[in-house]
């Protein structure tokens, strides 16, 4: 009888088989299962019920539940011809989890998982088994307190699988990086040269300011920060400041964007529109001498030209004979060209002279129409008085 019993056992369910059955009894430390097609009942110890820690079997199963498990051992009593299948539901869940995670790793897919615990080195998550997100793989940004993730469902990617050592490493940072790259590509495609947009000063260097314009940084060169001369970016902008910028150029291959704050600001000449008129006599300061005349600043950042013929009633060979930089002078406005931002001035017309000589209108016309040699551009006409102006 015993020999027949042993032979039937060998031909029956054996160790390593996968079986199904119905939960008949839930005890404190184990679950009794009626095995479909089996000669005995199955026993699932509490430690083999779940991939997670549980204090009671009732947390995961109840009587009448259909369960699937691996047979880890077959026990039988030859004398009484009784036995039991020792089962592991945990082993089967772990196997399914690894299979699922391997597929996601192979396809570089995103999964969602709940953070079950926050530890010093990172986050513990539930991915069908215990998974770990190291601190270095939590975010692309610095996060001081990881407790904000406790209990949250997060989007992650599988970074590493090692079933032999029961090791599952995941990355939330990889998902963020992928999303940031997608936003960056979309933004780069939507931007065009000449667009005026808003951004935030991200960092400052000696040569300019980097502006975050929505996931992409663009550079405002120090020469594009203001109409007036700027020594260092800190003179006009600060980190975190919201600014308006104009896109000067885009290189989508290298993801380099050149920006300008200066181009979004009114020029010094625009700031004085309506303030001065032809024939007004005003005060100014000599800022530069040239062979053909003197440049006089009549308002912060605005310079006009006094042609050499308009400096004195007497003939002079060079402006330096009667003028020097820094000298205060009275000037009369002979003409204003708003389109080209030019002002023609005369010192001579403000000086007393018994034999009054009228200003030569051809000289004024030549300057305003850009016929003089070495005529200044708007850059030549910008002084340094607005250095301390903040945007």
From Swiss-Prot:
Keyword match Glycoprotein: no
Cross-referenced CDD domains: S1_RPS1_repeat_ec1_hs1, S1_RPS1_repeat_ec2_hs2, S1_RPS1_repeat_ec3
Domain S1 motif: 16-90, 108-173, 194-262, 279-348
InterPro entries: NA-bd_OB-fold, Ribos_protein_bS1-like, Ribosomal_protein_S1-like, S1_domain
An annotated Gene Ontology molecular function: structural constituent of ribosome
GO biological process, one term: translation
GO cellular component: cytosolic small ribosomal subunit
Family matches, as SUPFAM superfamilies: Nucleic acid-binding proteins
Coiled coil location: none
SMART domains named among the record's database cross-references: S1 (SM00316)
The UniProt record lists the keyword Ribosomal protein: yes
Keywords tagged on the record: Repeat, Ribonucleoprotein, Ribosomal protein, RNA-binding
Function: Binds mRNA; thus facilitating recognition of the initiation point. It is needed to translate mRNA with a short Shine-Dalgarno (SD) purine-rich sequence.
Membership in a protein family: Belongs to the bacterial ribosomal protein bS1 family.
Protein name: Small ribosomal subunit protein bS1
């Amino acid at each position: 009888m015993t020999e027949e019993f042993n032979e039937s056992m060998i031909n029956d369910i054996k160790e390593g088989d996968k079986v199904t059955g119905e939960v008949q009894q839930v005890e404190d430390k184990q679950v009794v299962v009626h095995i479909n097609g089996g000669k005995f009942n199955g026993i699932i110890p509490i430690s083999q019920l779940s991939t997670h820690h549980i204090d009671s079997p009732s947390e995961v199963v109840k009587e009448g539940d259909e369960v699937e498990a691996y047979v880890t051992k077959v026990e039988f009593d030859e004398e009484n011809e009784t036995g039991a299948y020792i089962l592991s539901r945990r082993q089967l869940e772990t196997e399914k989890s690894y299979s699922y995670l391997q597929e996601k790793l192979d396809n570089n897919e995103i999964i969602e998982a709940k953070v079950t615990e926050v530890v010093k080195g990172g986050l513990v998550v539930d991915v069908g088994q215990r998974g770990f997100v190291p601190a270095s793989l939590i975010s692309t940004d610095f996060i001081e307190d990881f407790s904000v993730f406790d209990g949250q469902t997060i989007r992650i990617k599988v970074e590493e699988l090692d079933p032999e050592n029961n090791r599952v490493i995941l990355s939330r940072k990889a998902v963020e990086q992928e999303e940031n790259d997608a936003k960056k590509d979309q933004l780069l495609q939507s931007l065009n040269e000449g667009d005026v947009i808003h951004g935030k000063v991200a960092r400052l260097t000696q040569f300019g300011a980097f502006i975050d314009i929505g996931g992409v940084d663009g550079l405002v060169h120090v020469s594009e920060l203001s109409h007036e001369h700027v020594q260092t970016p800190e003179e006009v902008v600060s980190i975190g400041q919201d600014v308006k910028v104009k896109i000067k150029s885009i290189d989508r291959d290298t993801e380099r964007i050149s920006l300008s704050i200066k181009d979004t600001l009114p020029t010094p000449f625009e700031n004085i529109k309506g303030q001065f008129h032809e024939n007004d006599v005003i005060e100014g300061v000599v800022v530069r001498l040239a062979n053909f005349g003197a440049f006089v600043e009549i308002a912060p950042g605005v310079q006009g030209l006094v042609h050499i013929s308009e400096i004195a009633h007497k003939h002079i060979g060079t402006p330096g004979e009667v003028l020097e930089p820094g000298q205060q002078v009275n000037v009369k406005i002979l003409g204003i060209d708003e389109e080209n931002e030019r002002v023609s001035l005369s010192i001579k017309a403000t000086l007393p002279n018994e034999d009054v000589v009228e200003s030569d209108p051809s000289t004024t016309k030549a300057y305003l129409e850009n016929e003089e040699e070495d005529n200044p551009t708007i850059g030549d006409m910008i002084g340094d008085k607005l250095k301390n102006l903040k945007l």
